[in-house]
Amino acid sequence: MSEQKDMYVLGIETSCDETAAAIVKNGKEIISNVVASQIESHKRFGGVVPEIASRHHVEQITLVIEEAFRKAGMTYSDIDAIAVTEGPGLVGALLIGVNAAKALSFAYNIPLVGVHHIAGHIYANRLVEDIVFPALALVVSGGHTELVYMKEHGSFEVIGETLDDAAGEAYDKVARTMGLPYPGGPQIDKLAEKGNDNIPLPRAWLEEGSYNFSFSGLKSAVINTLHNASQKGQEIAPEDLSASFQNSVIDVLVTKTARAAKEYDVKQVLLAGGVAANRGLRAALEKEFAQHEGITLVIPPLALCTDNAAMIAAAGTIAFEKGIRGAYDMNGQPGLELTSYQSLTR
């Protein structure tokens, strides 16, 4: 019996403000992973400017793909599939990656696979260790906060999601109100390490048994706290405000994740998304799940938490194995829903 041939997938990611390309072997092993960040270009605006993001993607896309091949020491003849982020994201940014992937697929006759950005974040964990099912993913990013139950590869059931602001969005808005530089999340995380949780802030548990999240009330409470202090001529230590805000967010995230993991009897909990780089959240989850027998916690390294193309290649490998193929009329879909792979085969 002959050995199964290794599968090499080229991943392309341009959903927001990182232009990325990567080559991944068998959905698990990173051969190359190249990311061109735009943070410096967006800093002075206090957030991502879609038009600027698109222009940077146009400038960088060919370069990062070429660099991914150079670092891997490979050519297009070695590639079995091209996986690209189809959505969600900024439509102009998505189109750069999708059009590049379609052009390469056509030029080199390589199968094309569209990938959901959040599926990519979840599958970043497979680049660390095998996913054991049933699994629960806590997805925390600038645009998403979700609890996703997975009974098998490519199966996604959203059991909880934010009703308003995503956790990362709340971090950025609070940081902006505090006068912290962009991106605000890492700044709050650093300050929180030095501060005390001594400012009373709300925690939105919502209705009993709910796995949904809400951070708009917390965000407003922080803004009101700062405004009231300013009106009274008082100063609030940014370290203490950061610690109080961050603990309010983490408390809800960790408590609901632990409760869902128990109720759904999962074997593994996966942390995913840009906010997964938050040291306070990582430490709180590690402390919580050290007490849960039979559940392993997987946290990707920092470089795989933020947007990258290795995670897109990893998710694309699973989609490809399930028979999913993208057509040349593929488009960027800014509002793409996270749907199980088996219902997408086309």
UniProtKB/Swiss-Prot annotation:
It comes from the Bacteria. InterPro entries: ATPase_NBD, Gcp-like_dom, KAE1/TsaD, Peptidase_M22_CS, TsaD. The keyword Chloroplast does not apply. Its main location: cytoplasm. Its EC number is 2.3.1.234. It comes from Bacillus subtilis (strain 168). Required for the formation of a threonylcarbamoyl group on adenosine at position 37 (t(6)A37) in tRNAs that read codons beginning with adenine. Is involved in the transfer of the threonylcarbamoyl moiety of threonylcarbamoyl-AMP (TC-AMP) to the N6 group of A37, together with TsaE and TsaB; this reaction does not require ATP in vitro. TsaD likely plays a direct catalytic role in this reaction. Substrate binds at V139, V140, S141, G142, G143, D172, G185, D189, N278. It is an enzyme of class 2 (transferase). It is found in: Cytoplasm. This is tRNA N6-adenosine threonylcarbamoyltransferase. Belongs to the KAE1 / TsaD family. It holds the Pfam family TsaD. Fe cation binds at H117, H121, D307. Keywords: Acyltransferase, Cytoplasm, Iron, Metal-binding, Transferase, tRNA processing. The lineage of its organism: Bacteria, Bacillati, Bacillota, Bacilli, Bacillales. May form a heterodimer with TsaB. It catalyses: L-threonylcarbamoyladenylate + adenosine(37) in tRNA = N(6)-L-threonylcarbamoyladenosine(37) in tRNA + AMP + H(+). GO terms for cellular component: cytoplasm. Gene3D superfamilies: 3.30.420.40. PANTHER family: TRNA N6-ADENOSINE THREONYLCARBAMOYLTRANSFERASE (PTHR11735), TRNA N6-ADENOSINE THREONYLCARBAMOYLTRANSFERASE, MITOCHONDRIAL (PTHR11735:SF6). The keyword Transferase applies. One of its GO terms (molecular function) is iron ion binding. Binds 1 Fe(2+) ion per subunit. Its cofactor is Fe(2+). The four proteins YwlC, TsaD, TsaB and TsaE are necessary and sufficient for tRNA(NNU) t(6)A37 threonylcarbamoyladenosine biosynthesis in vitro in B.subtilis. GO terms for biological process: tRNA threonylcarbamoyladenosine modification.
